[in-house]
From Swiss-Prot:
The keyword Transmembrane helix does not apply. Homodimer. Residues 251-255 are annotated as: ACP-binding. GO terms for biological process: fatty acid biosynthetic process; secondary metabolite biosynthetic process. Pfam families: ACP_syn_III, ACP_syn_III_C. Its EC number is 2.3.1.180. The last Arg residue of the ACP-binding site is essential for the weak association between ACP/AcpP and FabH. Coiled coil: none annotated. Keywords: Acyltransferase, Cytoplasm, Fatty acid biosynthesis, Fatty acid metabolism, Lipid biosynthesis, Lipid metabolism, Multifunctional enzyme, Transferase. HAMAP family: FabH. The gene is fabH. PANTHER family: 3-OXOACYL-[ACYL-CARRIER-PROTEIN] SYNTHASE 3 (PTHR34069), BETA-KETOACYL-[ACYL-CARRIER-PROTEIN] SYNTHASE III (PTHR34069:SF2). This is Beta-ketoacyl-[acyl-carrier-protein] synthase III. It is found in: Cytoplasm.
Length: 323
């Protein structure tokens, strides 16, 4: 008998303020048609003044707890994936812990940009399987619009703010191997960090900086690396894409989603796409999309889900789990 983690609930949150493509066209040289054709994005949400990453995370976490039928006091682990923390330190997860009023336990951040949620999920799952923790919140939350150069049309049209969360519970398990959280594949190639980065930092410039990206190169690496991560998970488990009920990818842009689906021969109807409604929310996008497909009733208990992502670093990965 071993230990197995199960997803007990999902939740998400998007700030009230909506920024449309037409509004962006008044700020930079672009159009709604240009943005939609190249990215599939129609709008993005922007955090209000004074609305922190921890606030967004708390909203998403509360909804996940409600869906799980659990109280915050039952949680003994919080792993928060974010690139846009409230402060340099302490970890934003500690603010989430305090605001939620969770029980005694651990709370820390993981930073792997757009693939951060998968790294956070793999970390929480590993710690729980060791018996160190029993009930966890795994959260992705971002105020990414605060590191955007609004004069750079190559990046400012792509990103938005938001948060998503899941509740994980780890229990003694002697059942089927393909139940709950099944496996993860995470990788990083630091030699490509100059292709997608923020040009500022505490120890380098002493400034916050803005997102800089070589879009065409990022696209090519994303399709290649994400496809490789999917293949690694399928090979490890002896599955094929036909066995997967839903692919819930990082919502970067529709061109990348379509490129991966084509390369891996994944039917379009199996791919969950929400990027049109909230743009690229970095670490928040996978739990946002997962919550969407669950609450819409499309994904049902027992469905097999594969999530995949790539972000700056480059860091990428995939996780396989059954609802």
């Amino acid at each position: 008998m071993g230990r197995r983690s199960f997803i007990r609930g999902t939740g998400s949150y998007l700030p009230e303020r909506v920024l449309t493509n037409d509004e962006l066209s008044e700020m930079v040289e672009t159009t709604d048609a240009w943005i939609q054709e190249r990215t599939g994005i129609k709008k993005r949400h922007v955090a209000a003044d004074g609305e922190l990453t921890s606030d967004i995370a708390v909203h998403a976490a509360r909804r996940a707890l409600e869906a799980a039928g659990m109280q915050a006091s039952e949680i003994d682990l919080i792993v928060l994936a974010t690139t846009t923390p409230d402060q340099t330190f302490p970890a934003t997860a500690t603010a989430v812990q305090a605001k939620l009023g969770t029980g005694p336990g651990a709370a820390f951040d993981v930073q792997a940009v757009c693939s951060g949620f998968l790294f956070a999920l793999a970390t929480a799952d590993s710690l729980m399987k060791q018996g160190l923790f029993h009930k966890a919140l795994v959260i992705g939350a971002e105020t990414f619009t605060r590191i955007i150069d609004w004069s750079d049309r190559g990046t400012c049209v792509l990103f938005g703010d938001g948060g998503g969360a899941i509740v994980l519970e780890c229990v003694e398990w002697d059942g089927a191997d393909d139940a709950g959280v099944i496996t993860h594949h995470v990788r990083t190639d630091g030699t490509k960090s100059n292709l997608l980065y923020v040009d500022g930092g505490v120890s380098s410039t002493g400034t916050i900086g803005h997102v800089r990206m070589e879009g065409n190169k990022v696209f090519k690496h994303a399709v290649t690396n994400i496809s490789a991560a999917i293949e690694a998970v399928l090979t490890e488990t002896g599955l094929t894409s036909a066995d997967i009920d839903w692919f819930v990818p990082h919502q970067a842009n529709k061109r990348i989603l379509d490129g991966v689906a084509k390369k891996m021969s994944i039917p379009e109807e199996k791919v969950v796409i929400t990027v049109s409604e909230h743009a690229n929310t970095s670490a928040a996008s996978i739990p946002l999309a997962l919550d969407h497909v669950v609450r819409s009733g499309r994904a049902k208990p027992g469905d097999l889900i594969l999530s995949e992502a790539m972000g700056g670093g480059f860091s990428w990965g995939a996780s396989l789990f059954r609802l």
